[in-house]
Amino acid sequence: MADKKRYEELINILDQYSYDYYVIDNPTVEDAEYDQKMQELLKIEEAHPEWVTPESPSKRVGGEVLEGFKKVAHDTPMLSLANAFNQEDLADFDRRIRDKVGDDIAYMCELKIDGLAVSLQYENGKYKQGATRGDGTIGEDITANLRTIRSIPMKLQKDYSIEVRGEAFMPKRSFQKLNEIREEEGQMLFANPRNAAAGSLRQLDTKIAASRNLDIFLYAVADFGEMGVETHSAGLDMLETLGLKVNKERRLCNSLEEVYAYIEEWTEKRAGLAYDIDGIVLKLNNLEQQRQMGNTVKSPRWSIAYKFPAEEVPTKLLDIELNVGRTGVITPTAVLEPVRVAGTTVSRASLHNEDLITEKDIRIGDTVLIKKAGDIIPEVIKSITEKRSGSEEPFHMPKNCPACDSELVRLEEEVALRCINPKCPAQIKEGLIHFVSRNAMNIDGLGEKVIIQLFSQHLIKDVADLFFLSKEKLLELERMGEKSVTNLLASIQASKQNSLEKLLFGLGIRHVGAKAAKSLAIHFDTMDNLKVADKETLTSINDIGEKMADSIVTYFANEEVHDLLEELKRAGVNMTYTGPKLEDMSEEELVFTGKTVVLTGKLEKLTRNDAKALIESLGGNVSGSVSKKTDVVVAGSDAGSKLAKAEELAIPIWSEEDLIEYLPDEGGLNE
């Protein structure tokens, strides 16, 4: 008969075996011996379930089925990092550091793992909770799934109570095996290891998470200072002594030249790693100097992520298709011979507008170079003209809409061509898809395919029709069974109670994003008040600029809009603001309301006018100079004296990417 002492001994032995194998990559026993001891442990646990603790090695194989993922607050925010794309960006970062703390500095350089940022909490040395980064303040509880990662110790070598940050990832070999299995089973393949890791950690069945063979590198403690160390490098060393897995390829650099050499080395060697990396992270090593530098709204001033240059890959441009957005903008899209770029297969890419196609002389049949902007959005960089055979065809934008044949127009100060026919079926369809989306009316079960079916079968012609759908009609649709239809109708019914801002955003009024919709709802309280507001009243609201005000007035002057609103009222859709009033709202919810914002440097994705309009739509006032009254500086590349002054005055600095997070769904302000 087993005794508890033997049980505890087995736990310690198996923990040590796991540490040797998964953390320090130095296995000390054969698999057969590990399996024999694990079986012995499992038999004891079967006989004595009262002895089993959450730290038992048996918990790593999964088996628990979760109901969902609850939200958890991070005691210390998990900030994102500002990006650097070249040596000039790094030199600017270094200058800001030296201006603030002097020249006696060193940088800890670490590989930027391409995975999922997570937080691990240990209480008295025992693993207590694991969470995703989420929005940096609130994440999701994935404790059970993280427990299945063998390189995460359930007990530390010392009884510390700490919160550790790291990057969970799927090794390349595990990713390849997983996709091979999925292909054999006829399942959709994962695009890249990052997506596979994220999907694995959000499995409700922990056995599935356990089968995915994830790994982790830990790179920080929420507050290293609590551990009695003075430098980041010493903190990483201490994490290793606690039994945590820290990446060995880190290097302490005493100059920018050493940083550049480290980057160059890993730019060349990255392909040979067992896992994906997408850059190098620099951290000011001295913790006191880190505290002196402080943080911006989104990121620490003492750290930066150098992003590897986007991979550029040649492929064939087979065709150029035209897409009609919900506001009528005609967007050309490149149809490509499928090719792998930055870990995913790309068969379509953005061409932005006609002017860009003409300027770059891109022709159908060309061999073109493509890359992923920010490693996310595929785009065509240029044609490789020396590979032309003479059969390539220049592209010309049509004069009429590809969806409704109406004449296309180019509005003043706009680059894009636009269809202005309010009856255009493509615009109506895209508008319906937008209306039911998460940030708008959030109607579960009404995905794009269902909307297309409903529209093509003439069951809906506008958003009001959604609220008059019958069970009988829905059951006639493909892949819509009794349960799906019941759930969908319940979701439609629930959406009627949404607060006014959700409806306003869903209506797709030109230039009105989610944040502006909320400000309008708060200010006017009811749809009836808003629809009679004049331009002067609208522009008196901090969030609303002249262009947006004109758009709102024009929208509500349309008799068809009045008819639509009456139909929505008849359906029982709420048209009153039911959320917290302005005085009760947090600063985070208000974003830029009442704040002065300065733009500086070169923006890569937004025009200066777009950025200004977006800031105004979020309630901010754009100023041309930095002063003590400035609340936020949005800095692009090549930012000069304004950025330096903002740093000197300790003004929060946003990147262009931070600002883009608040774009309306269609991604543009001139649409």
Swiss-Prot record:
Q: Which domain of life is it from?
A: Bacteria
GO terms of molecular function: DNA binding; DNA ligase (NAD+) activity; metal ion binding
- Catalysed reaction, written as an equation: NAD(+) + (deoxyribonucleotide)n-3'-hydroxyl + 5'-phospho-(deoxyribonucleotide)m = (deoxyribonucleotide)n+m + AMP + beta-nicotinamide D-nucleotide
GO CC field:
cytosol
The record's Gene3D superfamilies line, in alphabetical order, gives: 5' to 3' exonuclease, C-terminal subdomain, 6.20.10.30, BRCT domain, DNA ligase/mRNA capping enzyme, Helix hairpin bin, Nucleic acid-binding proteins
Annotated residues that bind NAD(+) are located at D31, A32, E33, Y34, D35, S80, L81, E110, R133, E167, K283, K307
Q: Which family does it belong to?
A: Belongs to the NAD-dependent DNA ligase family. LigA subfamily.
Main function? DNA ligase that catalyzes the formation of phosphodiester linkages between 5'-phosphoryl and 3'-hydroxyl groups in double-stranded DNA using NAD as a coenzyme and as the energy source for the reaction. It is essential for DNA replication and repair of damaged DNA.
Q: From the Swiss-Prot or TrEMBL record, give the protein name.
A: DNA ligase
Q: Which gene encodes it?
A: ligA
